[in-house]
């Protein structure tokens, strides 16, 4: 307890004494409080779980929702062991033999699988998060244990959303907005590109030449084609023959988070996922 209190105070003092702008410090430290709130908890066996948030007296939306926690970074850097435990849950306990990753980890909470269509940003994003956890920890045993299920998850995504394997996702994609996007869209495709690059790098390190080559070729094809299809001269847009065919499509609109895959690529040193001038 004394060690935890000492390190916590030192961390807090270091942040507030830094040269970061006051608005950045306030935003970062305010959001860190979620980690010590009722949003986060551990069960008897030590496994970590988190709601999407907390209501007045109950948690809101359980099960480490992959396409919500995909946006979080703090725990991976402050409490990396807990974050690695989440990846173990995602891949070892919530990804089936077909590669379908349930985006809510419910098996240990109520004994039942969530049994919903997979989320493109959650499933592809969790592959990038696996790469992040390994880079932070350097734990080769951790990576090797999760790698087979990561391969299944990525190949499942290709089957579901890139049915013609031209490298561009255009299937029915459940996303963080709790809707399905159709056609070629920036949110899904940037998450996919980040997953391909992450998988390529992990395969290279593990000596898996077959998958390293496969994901490199897919990435090169996907990057060029997705960029040319979605770039309208000013920004990336959703490509859909009839934007009114389905509800909740954004079409020529811009999503605030449509470049989340690139955000991860920058954090992980993976470079630009599509034309750098367009991304900028």
Identify the residue ranges that each predicted region occupies.
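Short cytoplasmic-facing helical segments at TM-TM junctions of multi-pass membrane proteins
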Residues: 1-2, 210
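Substrate-binding groove/exosite segments of carbohydrate-active enzymes
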Residues: 2-159, 165, 170-174, 251-279
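Hydrophobic, small-residue-rich alpha-helical packing segments that form membrane-like cores
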Residues: 155, 166-231
């Amino acid at each position: 307890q004394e060690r935890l209190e000492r390190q916590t105070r030192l961390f807090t003092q270091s942040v507030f004494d830094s040269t970061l702008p006051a608005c950045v410090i306030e935003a970062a430290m305010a959001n860190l409080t979620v980690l010590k709130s009722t949003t986060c908890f551990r069960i008897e066996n030590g496994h970590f779980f988190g709601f999407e948030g907390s209501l007045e007296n109950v948690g809101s939306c359980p099960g480490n929702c992959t396409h919500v926690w995909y946006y979080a970074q703090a725990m991976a850097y402050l409490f990396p062991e807990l974050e690695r435990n989440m990846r173990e849950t995602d891949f070892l306990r919530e990804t089936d033999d077909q590669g379908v990753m349930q985006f809510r980890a419910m098996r240990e909470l109520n004994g039942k699988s969530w049994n919903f269509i997979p989320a493109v940003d959650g499933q592809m994003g969790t592959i990038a998060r696996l790469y992040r956890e390994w880079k932070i920890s350097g734990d080769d045993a951790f990576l090797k244990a999760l790698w087979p299920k990561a391969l299944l998850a990525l190949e499942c995504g290709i089957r579901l959303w890139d049915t013609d394997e031209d490298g561009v996702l255009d299937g029915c994609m459940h996303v963080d907005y709790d809707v399905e996007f159709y056609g070629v869209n920036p949110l899904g495709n940037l998450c996919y590109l980040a997953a391909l690059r992450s998988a390529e790098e992990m395969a290279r390190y593990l000596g898996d030449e077959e998958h390293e080559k496969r994901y490199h070729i897919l990435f090169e094809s996907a990057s060029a084609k997705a960029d040319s299809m979605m770039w309208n001269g000013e920004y990336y847009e959703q490509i859909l023959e009839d934007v009114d065919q389905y509800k909740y499509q954004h079409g020529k609109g811009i999503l605030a988070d449509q470049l989340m895959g690139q955000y991860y690529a920058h954090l992980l040193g993976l470079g630009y996922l599509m034309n750098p001038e367009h991304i900028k």
